[in-house]
Amino acid sequence: MIFHRLHQIIILLIYLSLSATSYGYTFEHKIENYGLTFATHTVDQDHRTSLILNSGKGISFPAEGFIMNFDIKLRQELYTYGYILRVISHNDQNLDLVSYLYDSKISIISGSSHEKSQMVYLADSMLIKKDQWMPIQIQFFPNSAKIKINGKNIYLSHSFRDFNDVQIIFGASNLGRFFSGDVAPMSIRNLSLQSLQGKTFYYWKLDRSSKTTNNFVYDSISDLPAYVKNGKWEIDKHYHWQRVTSFEIDYKNPQLAFDEIKGNFFVASDKKLYTYNVNNKTLDTLSFKGAPFLGVSSQMLFHPLKKTLLSYNIYHNKLNWFNPTTSSWSVNQKITVDDNQHHNRFFDKDHDKLYLYGGYGRHQYSGALYEYNLKDNFKWSQMNLDTLISPRYLSALGKYSDNKLLVLGGYGSHSGKQEDFPQNFYDLYLLNLNTGTCKKLWEMNHTDEHFVMGNSAIVDTLTNSIYALTYRNDCYNTAIYLSQFLIKTNRPIRQIVSDSILYKFRDIYSYCDLFYHPNDTSLYAVILEPSKNESSLCRIYKLAFPPLIPTKTSNIT
């Protein structure tokens, strides 16, 4: 927590080893996020996806047969039945693959217009899983076919009289008698057509950076076109924020926390706890007894060791714990604090310590660093950093290494007084928690566009980068971008690496934060804004990590 339409995409294949820290959790992983995503039953038939090789014209293969390879990723939706592909010979004989993820099943159907179809299927929940790439290979021989699905072989006969006129269609089909609007919820990539000896005739990587003109994508060997209708590209998820959900909160100043292990976002009002799970896409609500500490910025976090929520207040040494069994807080009364608004916080799970920095209240910007030791001290200790770093709020905080934090930007004044020339800060500091010292790493030149930060930053030490949500703080109707800054550099700049999210900035009454979820290697932006009748609106957005650099941006709502 204390953490480009593209004209051209630079990256053909993302094989990035990442080393970043979020909530004190260090992760290293590889990402291969590309492919063509098919729109299915969630849209009307006119907007479902097709991939038609050679624009629907027949392809000729050797008389002895050919091999088709591709990777597929099935996704869970309300309706999971649909065609993966149809292979059609002489507009008469066919071999189809049909998926039904609900039963972990893929069916293979072979038939023609003048005889009864033959059908076999693979139903295996250990092999056919949602949201996982798996290889499929189909070997066509003169009278039979061998289908290998994620390593499992299936055999059946077919009635193709030859391979001189073969049409191949993925997803929706409008080809005569082979019309179908049922599309499997899927993504595909690495599509190749080969000889039985392994010589590749055609290859479509399907990463959007391949040779593409209008709705056609061309294979990398012979420039054979494939027509894409209503397609979406997996790689777009690295620069377009996807709206995950939104819901109303029955309180004007809700509290926010995230459990990165289970993927739960917790939002608390003064009476209820809202829990949204990003894996299952479910929202649960429960009423509780007592209340968390309340204020205009979040003062709640998820304790990963105790696996529950805690609420904190710098004026109370006793922490406020949530008991999920009794649905109650350990503090029965409602306590509201107006100081220390929009402070940064970081929980060091390795040492079981909570750190707070900065904030605003009573016309004063804070330069204090607070520490709470949950192991033995059980009280707040304070260190003033005013002489080392100008007091501020609306900054971003992220863990750099053990006992070292990065403080990025913000708004405040050199003296801490609101009336004493308040200004935006475009700087980066390294804060040593052991020594209480602060080192200024750089300061950007003043920009014409004022901007501040979301509460948390994601630090990627391998690429020498720090990521934060940024937005203008000199207007009400503004927009949030994900921005990248180099940590060690002599020429610091802000690089926008996403499109935008509309944001209504009402100073301390609006709040946005950035989280990393290791299970789906994605960033999540959570926005809390005032709504009608003293309530709030929570919006959650998702971006695949690492982000890509766009040449154009567009607003989304």
Language-model-derived ranges and their functions:
Residues 22-52, 198-243:
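Extracytoplasmic low-complexity segments
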Residues 83-112:
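Glycan-recognition/cleft segments
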Residues 112-135:
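Short, aromatic/His-centered strand-loop micro-motif at the edge of beta-sheets
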Residues 132-146:
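Localized edge beta-strand/strand-to-loop motifs within extracellular or lumenal beta-rich domains
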Residues 156-187:
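Flexible glycan-contacting loops in extracellular carbohydrate-active proteins
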Residues 177-180, 357-361, 407-424, 468-479, ...:
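Short, conserved, GDST-rich strand-edge loop motifs in beta-rich repeat architectures
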Residues 367-378, 420-436, 478-491, 536-554:
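Beta-propeller blade signature
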Residues 389, 442-455, 488-518, 554-556:
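Conserved blade-ending motifs and adjacent loop-strand segments that build the rim/top face
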